[in-house]
Amino acid sequence: MIDIPGTPGTLTGLVLRISQCVFAAGSISYMVTSGGFFSFTAFCYLIAAMGLQVIWSFGLAILDTFALVRKKTLLSPVLVSLFVVGDWVTSTLSLAGASSSAGITVLYFGDLGSCSFEAECWKYQLSVALAFLCWITIAVSSLTTLWLLASA
């Protein structure tokens, strides 16, 4: 396997995992602190998808930290295959949650003008923006691990 920046067990891989955790946790926190998120199914789905992303990314960040401290490699084909599948699943779920929440945000709060609380609208929009940033970092990780698996 070739050395690609962002692969599991490297510092750039750890930075990607930590940024995924931070963006997903930020998205959850802004959505949960807004008042009526539970009345929109897309927002509830976004929280579920971002919650799964936090768990997945935090677990892999711990694994990356362990590999860096112990100077171990995480490039066995079985592990890389697991990373590819997990990253692609969480990437798909995160993109679906972010896109559906963005659609609801634009429809209800932009087109219909039914946002009477400005602070709540900003929280929804910020949560969706953080979800898309999370998805971008997941996409980078998943493409990196797929490229790594294909080069084996």
UniProtKB/Swiss-Prot annotation:
Expressed in the stele of the root and in leaves. The chain crosses the membrane at residues 22-42, 43-63, 78-98, 128-148. It is a multi-pass membrane protein. Signal peptide: none annotated. Residues 1-21, 99-127 are cytoplasmic. Keywords: Cell membrane, Membrane, Transmembrane, Transmembrane helix. The keyword Secreted does not apply. InterPro entries: CASP_dom, CASPL-5. It holds the Pfam family CASP_dom. Residues 64-77, 149-152 are extracellular. It is found in: Cell membrane. One of its GO terms (cellular component) is plasma membrane. Homodimer and heterodimers. Belongs to the Casparian strip membrane proteins (CASP) family. This is CASP-like protein 5B3. It comes from Arabidopsis thaliana.
